[in-house]
Design a protein with these regions (language model features):
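The feature marks the mature, well-folded catalytic cores of soluble enzymes
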Residues: 1-109
Length: 109
């Protein structure tokens, strides 16, 4: 797959594309771009490994059902996440045509 073709296709579909050499650079970029906002998380090992919940929750209101407070309501938390200003998830796949593929059991991607 040619990354430049993917970039062009995503841009044509209205996405802003940024790429990074390392996962740490990507996490730092998101941490500087999202500030003072509500942020919802879809269940994602990738986001966990990037440490984004810890980074963003220091200066945003973050909703993640993987970080459910004691006695919290997972369904209510997912609803809050879905209506956040920013919603972060990881895609299952992407086509060179710019189509993003998400398959999810809970429908939160």
């Amino acid at each position: 797959m040619d990354f430049m073709n993917v970039t062009k296709a995503l841009t044509a579909r209205g996405f802003k594309v940024s790429s990074f050499e390392t996962a740490k650079e990507a996490a730092e970029y998101l941490n500087t771009q999202i500030d003072g906002a509500t942020v919802g998380f879809g269940g994602s090992i990738t986001l966990e490994e990037l440490g984004l919940y810890a980074l963003l929750s220091g200066h945003n209101t973050v909703f993640s059902h993987w970080h459910l407070p004691e006695g919290g309501d997972a369904a209510a938390l997912r609803a809050q996440a879905a209506t956040s200003e920013h919603y972060l998830l990881s895609a299952n796949g992407i086509a060179e045509t710019g189509e993003i593929i998400n398959i999810d059991g809970a429908g939160n991607r």
